[in-house]
Amino acid sequence: MSLLAQLDQKIAANGGLIVSCQPVPDSPLDKPEIVAAMALAAEQAGAVAIRIEGVANLQATRAVVSVPIIGIVKRDLEDSPVRITAYIEDVDALAQAGADIIAIDGTDRPRPVPVETLLARIHHHGLLAMTDCSTPEDGLACQKLGAEIIGTTLSGYTTPETPEEPDLALVKTLSEAGCRVIAEGRYNTPAQAADAMRHGAWAVTVGSAITRLEHICQWYNTAMKKAVL
């Protein structure tokens, strides 16, 4: 059975939650063994897949979980706004570390390596390719190039203003166009994740609301301070 077919079964049985285990950089939680522990806890709680950033984190996680891992490498480049899995060597390193799916930036922006080249390299390793997109045009272009999974990950992050709510319209548009969509980006409540599934998402990735303790504390602190002003 193919990995996509296996995931279809898991999603039907468990609901389609993917947990992104990416601690705040330099946080006390930003250690491979802690990332792996969070991933294992998520798997035991019913997550159908895990999203991991960084080769060391992926290696540690691969050793303890059996669910599929979506791997990425983030870089801050001087000559490109693209941050997610920008280089061939990133793809190779993630494949060697045990990723099942490799996600890349799929936006139409200046980049060191073309999207189609990165997709070809992912497929060279026999792995599934996911593209993190920001618009319908991004997603449809990446689907035509052969990406098996389209993520709404970068919606709201390629423009000056980032909205508070997730982009359900993008999920619906891409799903209706025939894309296998992972909804991602600002899904901070179970209700929002459920809405994404109703709008046609294949699965939903949740990160900050589950694995970024600093963000969760900030949400509570902000709300509670407002309550006593």
Curated annotation (Swiss-Prot):
* UniProt keyword Isomerase present: yes
Superkingdom to which the source organism belongs: Bacteria
Q: Name one GO molecular function term.
A: N-acylglucosamine-6-phosphate 2-epimerase activity
Q: Which InterPro entries match?
A: Aldolase_TIM, NanE, RibuloseP-bd_barrel
Q: Which Pfam families match?
A: NanE
Q: State a GO cellular component annotated for this protein.
A: cytosol
Question: Pathway involvement?
Answer: Amino-sugar metabolism; N-acetylneuraminate degradation; D-fructose 6-phosphate from N-acetylneuraminate: step 3/5
The answer to whether the entry has keyword Isomerase is yes
Keywords carried by this UniProt record: Carbohydrate metabolism, Isomerase
Give the UniProt record's GO annotations in the biological process aspect: carbohydrate metabolic process; N-acetylmannosamine catabolic process; N-acetylneuraminate catabolic process
Under the heading CDD domains, the entry gives: NanE
Top-level EC class as recorded in UniProt: isomerase
The EC number(s) given in the record are 5.1.3.9
Q: Which reaction does it catalyse?
A: an N-acyl-D-glucosamine 6-phosphate = an N-acyl-D-mannosamine 6-phosphate
What this chain does, per the entry, is described as: Converts N-acetylmannosamine-6-phosphate (ManNAc-6-P) to N-acetylglucosamine-6-phosphate (GlcNAc-6-P).
User: Which NCBIfam families does the record cross-reference, listed alphabetically?
Assistant: PRK01130.1 (NF002231)
Under HAMAP family, the record lists: ManNAc6P_epimer (MF_01235)
Task: Give the record's family classification.
Answer: Belongs to the NanE family.
Name of the protein this chain belongs to: Putative N-acetylmannosamine-6-phosphate 2-epimerase
| Organism listed in the record | Shigella flexneri
The gene is nanE
